[in-house]
Amino acid sequence: MARTPLAVKYRPKTFDDMTEQRAIKDILENQIRTKTFQHGYLFTGPAGTGKTTSARIFANMINAGKGNPIEVDAASNSGVDNIRGIIEDAKRKPLDAEYKIFIIDECHSLSSGAWQALLKTLEESPKYAIFILCTTNPEKIPATILSRVQQYQFQKISNDGIFTRLYTIMDDEGYADCDKVIDEDSLRYIAKVANGGMRDAITLLDKCLSLSSDLTIENVLKTIGVEDYGTFIQMLYALVNKDGTSGIQIIEDIYNSGKDVKLFMKEFAKFILEVEKYILFRNFNYISLPNTMKEDLDDICENGNFIFDTMEFVVDVNNKIKWDSDPKTLIELSMLLYCKE
């Protein structure tokens, strides 16, 4: 039997289960208490911050658990005919609940004709019909729609909020009661990589645990496909020390292992940027690298002035190899020229 994904298993069922978004939850809960519902809502914000989940919870609370909301994925049902079907459905009174609630996810995908059809319904909505629109791209919503719905902006979830939720999931899954390794630094790194999205964080945690029940930084890096940071550090020192031999050997090893050297240089550029940010701020809250790299980064900081020169070289190489059919040769030639300067 297939195992239920953690993101599905731990999807919030109530507002209390949700992480953060306190102001939005307070307003919606107050509307439940006072029964002051709107006919149109627009939930906006980054992916994985709770928009669709909140819409489902809110719909369930409005109808006191009776009936189910009608969910539409606008990404695959974007045409005017799809919306007309919803409009016709909205004209019919609900049979098993007080309100008929429609949740339209990814609503920015709707066609202009679909928006026009929906506009009239929002203007003259039956008293029992409620529409909850969800989107990651509010700038694509017509102004005529925006003026007729109550908007809620969902914020990215903090790294601490995601970490706490991930730790709770690990605890609920029984990892704290066995001999498995739970590295808090690994959980905090997953939270950083998720970039404010709870769903992405839980999905990544699930993927990491599929690789190994021992959660370590090494396993997280392997799961997300990031080159070992040790290799990046070696390359950085090779460039700082103008050691062309070591630099080319690293590229040869990457190439011979079957990895894409163009992708390696792209990821190396991102690594250099994170190093520069650490040099500027000396604070892991501003970078996406794991806290376990503090000693390495502090050592690198002693060569701060040289790092800026290295960054310029890496940016230049990435621009050169972007469309080149033989990036390995171009990388090695550029490296030799740089190291001889």
Where do the language-model regions lie?
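P-loop/Walker A NTP-binding region and its immediately flanking N-terminal helices
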Residues: 1-163, 167-171, 184, 252-253
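Extended, largely alpha-helical regulatory/partner-binding modules appended to the mid-to-C-terminal parts
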Residues: 49, 55, 82, 134, ...
